[in-house]
Swiss-Prot record:
It is found in: Cytoplasm; Cell inner membrane. This is GTPase Era. Pfam families: KH_2, MMR_HSR1. GO terms for cellular component: cytosol; plasma membrane. Coiled coil: none annotated. Residues 154-156 are annotated as: G5.
Length: 301
């Protein structure tokens, strides 16, 4: 019987919207799992990413950005998901952006002060700071906010110092059996990952034109006789005008979204994919908690 020790633990990645949490997770895992886009609030579910290296297994919880506005049902549920992630982990990575400090950062910090888990502060996008002389005083300001386990300036985009974060994580994993097989990257279903890929392309190609009132349901996900997948995706928007926006002139926009989403799916699933997309108006879904539950927004709370 093998007596080799193994180490395993949960790590929450927290921070206000759009500071680079998903990009950091993807870099830590070495591949794209969490949806990344320049728009705030693109992560809506607690995606678990798993990184196994030898005896070490780090299980990352990628939270929605904690933010102060809680007006709509979807925002309330996103905040609840983020707060619940903080409560049951061995370690927290708190991501902030360059020399910016906002009331939202302060709110996240206050939640962390109440927690028991040690906190690594990841100061992201330091490569984008114009006035380098401002960086050191800002790092000192951050160091005075709470007793951080470590403060690491990083660039999640380029990967700078991400290995330092990974090293600190490994050191703090408790001795435990691995929760997942070593080839697992995420515990989310392929159906869920397909919907996230489509949603990322919507964010990417529609940019600021489309509000957050868009979601994706996978209505069909089956293996075909060619050894690939037939996937039907339903894009839900709140208004007729948004539907036209998603479809684009003579269907050009939805065609581009479909082509790019299919490429990513084929890479992730390592199999040919036949993807069909439809757009449907379902008004008020972002305000209706029952509708959100039916779309899986609270399946993990």
């Amino acid at each position: 019987m093998s007596t080799d020790k193994t180490y395993c633990g949960f790590i929450a990645i927290v921070g206000r919207p759009n500071v680079g949490k998903s990009t950091l997770l993807n870099k830590l895992l070495g591949q794209k799992i969490s949806i990344t886009s320049r728009k705030a609030q693109t992560t809506r579910h607690r995606i678990v990413g798993i990184h196994t290296e030898g005896p070490y297994q780090a299980i990352y919880v990628d939270t929605p950005g904690l933010h102060m506005e809680e007006k709509r049902a979807i925002n309330r549920l996103m905040n609840k998901a983020a707060s619940s992630s903080i409560g049951d982990v061995e370690l927290v990575i708190f991501v902030v952006e360059g020399t910016r400090w906002t009331p939202d950062d302060e709110m996240v910090l206050n939640k962390l002060r109440d927690g028991k888990a040690p906190v690594i502060l990841a100061v992201n996008k330091v490569d984008n700071v114009q006035e380098k002389a401002d960086l050191l005083p800002h790092l000192q300001f951050l160091a005075n906010q709470m007793n951080f386990l470590d403060i690491v300036p990083i660039s999640a985009e380029t990967g700078m110092n991400v290995d330092t974060i990974a090293g600190i994580v490994r050191k703090h994993l408790p001795e435990a059996i691995h929760h997942f097989p070593e080839d697992y990257i995420t515990d989310r279903s392929q159906r869920f990952m397909a919907s996230e890929i489509i949603r990322e392309k919507l964010m990417r190609f529609l940019g600021a034109e489309l509000p957050y009132s868009v979601t994706v349901e996978i209505e069909r996900f089956v293996t075909n006789e060619r050894g690939g997948y037939d996937i039907n995706g339903l894009i839900l928007v709140e208004r007729e005008g948004q539907k036209k926006m998603v479809i684009g002139n003579k269907g050009a926009k939805i065609k581009t979204i479909g082509i790019e989403a299919r490429k990513d799916m084929q890479e992730m699933f390592e199999a040919p994919v036949h993807l069909e997309l439809w757009v449907k108006v379902k008004s008020g879904w972002a305000d209706d908690e029952r509708a959100l539950r039916s779309l899986g927004y609270v399946d993990d709370l």
